[in-house]
Amino acid sequence: MRRGQNGVALITVLLVVAVVTIVCAGLIIRQQLAIRSSANQLHVRQAWHYALGGERLAEAVLRRDLRQGGENTREPVDHLGEAWARPMTPFKLDDGGELRVRIEDPSGRFNLNGLVRKRKVKPDSVKQFRRLLATLGMKEEIVQGLPDRLADWLDADQNPQGEQGAEDNQYLLEAPAYRAANRSFKDVSELRLLKLSEADYRRLLPFVSALPEDAPLNVNTASVPVLAAMFEIDPGQAENIVDARGREGFQSKDDFTKHLTQLGSKTGNVSYAVGTRYFQVISEVSLGDRRQVLVSTLQRGKDGKIRVMARDMGQGGLPIPSTGGDDWKKDER
C-alpha cells in the first residue's frame, strides 16, 4: 500500500515539475516576444523621427536655395544644377543605421490632376496624356483607354469618356467593388484603381505627379517624354530642348519660348514656368533590420515659408526620375 502511495506521490511531483516547466517556458517566450516587440516599436519611432529630420533638412536646403536665388525675383528659376537637386551624402546614424534624403521636383512631371479644370475635362490635356503614354511605349489599349478612365475618375459626372471610359457602373462590378472618386488625385498610387497593372504603373510613375490642377509645368526639370507630350514635338526635338537648357536651365519663360519657336512649335495653352512651388522629399531610413521611407510633398511660398502638403509612409521608395537625355528609354517596351 505504501509503495502505491509513493508511486502516486512521485507521479504527482513529476506532473507538477512538468507544469511548472511549461509555464516558465511560456513566460520566457512571452517575455522575449515582449522585448522584441518593444525593440521594434522603438526602432519604428526612431525611424519616424529620423525621417522627419530628413524632411527638416530638405526644408532648410529649399529655404537657402530661395535666398540664393533672390526672394524678390519676379520669375524664380529652379533647375537641376541647383543644390537641392544634387544627390546628398548618406548620413550615418548613431544606432548604426543610415539616412538618405532626396529632393525632387514633381512640377517637371505630367500633372494628372491637370486633365480637369473645375471638375470639367480638358480635351487638350487628355490628348497630351495620351501622347505621353505613346512616347513611353505603353501598350495600345493603355494609350487609348487610360486617359479616358483618368478623366472619368477626376470629373464630376457619371458619363463615361469615349469608348473605354469608366464610371461607378464599371467599378461596382469589381471585387471588391468601389466607386469613381470624382475628385482630384491625392496620390499617384490611385492610378492602380484604373485597371493598370503593377508593371505599367511602375513604368509610368517617374513621369507623373498629383499636384493642384493649376500647377504649371517646370520646363527646367521636365524629362524628354513629358516635354514631347506637352508641347506636341517629337522626342528628338525634346532632347534638343534638354541640351539647350543645360544644367543651369532656362532663365525665363521667354528664353524657353524662343527656343521652342526655333524648333517650329508653340507653347499653345500649356501652363508652364521655369521654377516650381512644389517639391517632393524622400527620406529613407535604414535602422537595424527595418527600412522606413517617408515621402513628403512640400509647397514653398515666395516668402520662403514651407508648408507640408502631405506625408506618406506607405511607399517602398521611389524610383530615380528620368531627367532627360536617353535614360528614359531604358525600360521602353
Swiss-Prot record:
Function: Component of the type II secretion system required for the energy-dependent secretion of extracellular factors such as proteases and toxins from the periplasm. Plays a role in pseudopilus assembly and seems to control its length. Interacts with the pseudopilus tip complex that is critical for the recognition and binding of secretion substrates. Type II pseudopilus confers increased bacterial adhesive capabilities.
Major subcellular location class: membrane
Matching SUPFAM superfamilies: GspK insert domain-like, Pili subunits
Assembly behavior: Type II secretion is composed of four main components: the outer membrane complex, the inner membrane complex, the cytoplasmic secretion ATPase and the periplasm-spanning pseudopilus. Interacts with the tip of the type II pseudopilus subunits XcpV, XcpU and XcpW. Interacts with core component XcpT.
Similarity section: Belongs to the GSP K family.
Keyword set, alphabetical order: Cell inner membrane, Cell membrane, Membrane, Protein transport, Transmembrane, Transmembrane helix, Transport
Membrane-spanning ranges: 8-29
Mutation effect (G7V): Complete loss of secretion
Subcellular location(s) per record: Cell inner membrane
Entry GO terms, CC: plasma membrane; type II protein secretion system complex
Protein name as it appears in the record: Type II secretion system protein K
All ranges on the Periplasmic side of the membrane: 30-333
Species, as recorded: Pseudomonas aeruginosa (strain ATCC 15692 / DSM 22644 / CIP 104116 / JCM 14847 / LMG 12228 / 1C / PRS 101 / PAO1)
Pfam families, sorted: T2SSK (PF03934), T2SSK_1st (PF21687)
Modification note: Cleaved by prepilin peptidase.
One annotated GO biological process: protein secretion by the type II secretion system
Propeptide: 1-7
Region (Disordered), start-end ranges: 313-333
InterPro entries per the UniProt record, alphabetical: GspK, GspK_central_sf, Pilin-like, T2SSK_SAM-like_1st, T2SSK_SAM-like_2nd
